[in-house]
């Protein structure tokens, strides 16, 4: 109990409630939220999340149409101790009606309590219609579908400078082989083809986990990737060691990156700052990296910096995409909860939330029913094109889905030693495998 109280007292918590708008606001409901919702006035659904203001307010604003059209109020509570508090609340009989869960592993943990409930039929139908099987799979536990996806983020991008490419006469590569032909040209011109930095304080090493993940899914596909997360395929498996060799030929090749050891001490946020001036030419990093460039940087297709899709390696793996996101998991079967679940799995919800993000954007959905034109930020359009591709091979960040002792522990430290100390692939793989928690 003292531990629980301790967690609660340091938690930053914000609670907000949607209010019912005047009846006139509900006149266009079929367009605003879609048809077929029950009128359930004076009902309230509680939602618990790690999202805090200002983003929490944007969620509340995006839900106003739903409340106006159904009468169902939504009370959202955000906490920076969400991942610690949710299991405590669920096991203690104080579960929220809906939780926005950021990791598939936490969803599985909640299902194991017996308190999470499978998604209603209409939600399942929406997810089947609008999301790729990969996305649906991450909301599924023990062959039962529980949680519709919420937002999405895109990792499979390579940052570059359109201005520097134009100046040098380079074309954006559209295949893995083309990217390395281009890197060879850059090396011949005495340019640093790839920037790199895996420094991140106590989380140093995480960018290297992303590079390995990008290669594993591209070389060996989603099945091997999933088996790697569960440790059916070990790090010492020939496939994973082959993927590590591919990463080494890419990001540990002095011809392409210069000083390999410097990658271990360069902060990830600083790694690509030389791209606008041509100090280095390409950086594999997620869509959020745009925020690292200083004010005044032209982030556009013909500007100082832009990004292209990191191409596949194995033609049998269709459009590999690594990303992340959150999922709506319910702990109640009350009609008002299911109505909200249904709405949160529609393009109408995604469009409402995108609109509240404003012209700067930054909120993405992998819902294929959302037109790319809904995004006002061109970078969001680029990311959403791949995230919402129903034929893509989508995978979730593997280190986030592995046991924390590995994915946020030994994998970080061992991959850092790989870069900083030249530790062998075999020794790195063995050390990570040996650290895997016993079942």
Would you name each region that the model predicts?
Residues 295-361:
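Extracytoplasmic/periplasmic substrate-recognition and gating elements
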Residues 23-108, 122, 427, 434-439:
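Conserved N-terminal structural module of periplasmic/extracytoplasmic solute-binding proteins
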Residues 146-150, 180-233:
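Extracytoplasmic/periplasmic solute-binding protein
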């Amino acid at each position: 109990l003292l531990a629980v109280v301790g967690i609660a007292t340091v938690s930053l918590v914000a609670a907000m409630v949607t209010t019912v708008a005047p009846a006139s606001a509900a006149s266009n409901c079929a367009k605003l939220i879609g048809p077929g919702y029950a009128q359930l006035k004076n009902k309230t659904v509680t939602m618990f999340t790690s999202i805090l203001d200002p983003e929490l307010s944007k969620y509340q604003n995006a839900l106003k149409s739903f409340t106006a059209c159904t009468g169902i109020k939504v009370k959202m509570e955000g906490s920076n101790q969400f991942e610690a508090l949710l299991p405590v609340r669920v096991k203690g009989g104080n579960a929220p009606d809906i939780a926005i869960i950021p990791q598939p592993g936490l969803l599985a943990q909640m299902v194991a309590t017996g308190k999470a409930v499978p998604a209603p039929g209409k939600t399942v139908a929406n997810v089947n219609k609008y999301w790729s099987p990969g996305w649906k799979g991450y909301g599924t536990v023990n062959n039962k579908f529980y949680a519709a996806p919420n937002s999405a983020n895109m990792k499979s991008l390579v940052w570059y400078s359109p201005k520097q490419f134009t100046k040098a006469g380079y074309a954006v590569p559209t295949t893995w082989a083309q990217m390395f032909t281009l890197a060879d040209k850059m090396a011949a011109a005495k340019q640093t083809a790839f920037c790199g930095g895996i420094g991140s304080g106590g989380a140093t090493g995480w960018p290297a986990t992303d590079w390995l993940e990008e290669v594993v899914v591209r070389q060996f596909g989603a099945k091997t990737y999933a088996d790697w997360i569960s440790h059916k395929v070990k790090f010492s498996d020939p496939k994973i060691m082959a993927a590590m060799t591919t990463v080494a030929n890419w990001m540990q090749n002095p011809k392409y990156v210069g000083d390999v050891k410097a990658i271990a001490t360069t902060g990830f946020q600083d790694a690509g700052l030389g791209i606008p001036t041509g100090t280095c030419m390409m950086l594999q990093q997620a869509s959020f990296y745009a925020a690292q460039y200083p004010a005044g940087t032209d982030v556009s297709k013909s500007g100082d910096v832009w990004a292209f899709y990191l191409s596949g390696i194995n033609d049998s793996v269709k459009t590999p995409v690594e990303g992340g996101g959150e999922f709506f998991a319910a702990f109640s079967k009350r009609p008002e909860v299911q109505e909200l679940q249904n709405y949160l799995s529609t393009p109408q919800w995604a469009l409402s939330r995108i609109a509240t993000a404003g012209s700067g954007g930054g909120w993405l959905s992998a819902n294929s029913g959302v037109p790319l034109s809904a995004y006002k930020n061109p970078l969001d359009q680029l990311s959403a094109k791949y995230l919402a591709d129903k034929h893509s091979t989508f995978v979730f960040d593997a280190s986030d889905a592995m046991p924390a002792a590995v994915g946020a522990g030994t994998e970080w430290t061992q991959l850092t030693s790989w870069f900083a100390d030249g530790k062998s692939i075999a020794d790195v793989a063995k050390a990570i495998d040996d650290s895997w928690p016993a079942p």
